[in-house]
Amino acid sequence: MEEMFCFQCQQTAHNTGCEGHTGVCGKKSDTANLQDELTGELIRLARAVAENERSRSSDELMLKGLFTTITNVNFNSDTVKKLSDEIREEAENRKPGKDAYNVQKIWEAPEDIRSLKSLILFGLRGTAAYAYHAWALGYVDAEIMNFFYKGMRILGEEKGMEELLPVVIETGKINLRCMELLDKANTESYGDPIPTEVPLTIEK
């Protein structure tokens, strides 16, 4: 079993990153490495979509792929691999011959570049969680979706700090916009949330 590297949550080993065969959260190295491969496939998809129009299928795969890789969401290696295969097929149908991006390049980049690209990547993953829940309720925002592709493409490009910093700021702005979208989706679907008493008894 290959070793892993993962440092996207605040509970990483020694506050530097989980290595070896199992993370602090229990994620196995094979799953962590498959999630890196999935991320590389998403970058390939983003590049392919840059030369074509995005579609409902590519949007769904982008959201599912990013959501699948956030902390403690999916530790099923078979599911992660299946999703990678679907993303690869979508990208191949759009732009044959494009290779998946090797995410190790991000982890091995100079510290400042690694930090900025990580902020973008982890921000996109978190935003995708909001966007996917809004998507499930039938709410989609074109500006948000377009930024997922833009952000993932930039991760696969050679960029300096001056070019990455504005994207980090934009990631934050898009995240707020997505939170507004999810709030709208929830309130229009379920009504305004109100304080409600609930029983605290333990039931079988």
Regions from the PLM with identified roles:
Residues M1-K204:
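Metallocofactor- and cofactor-centric catalytic cores in central/energy metabolism, strongly enriched
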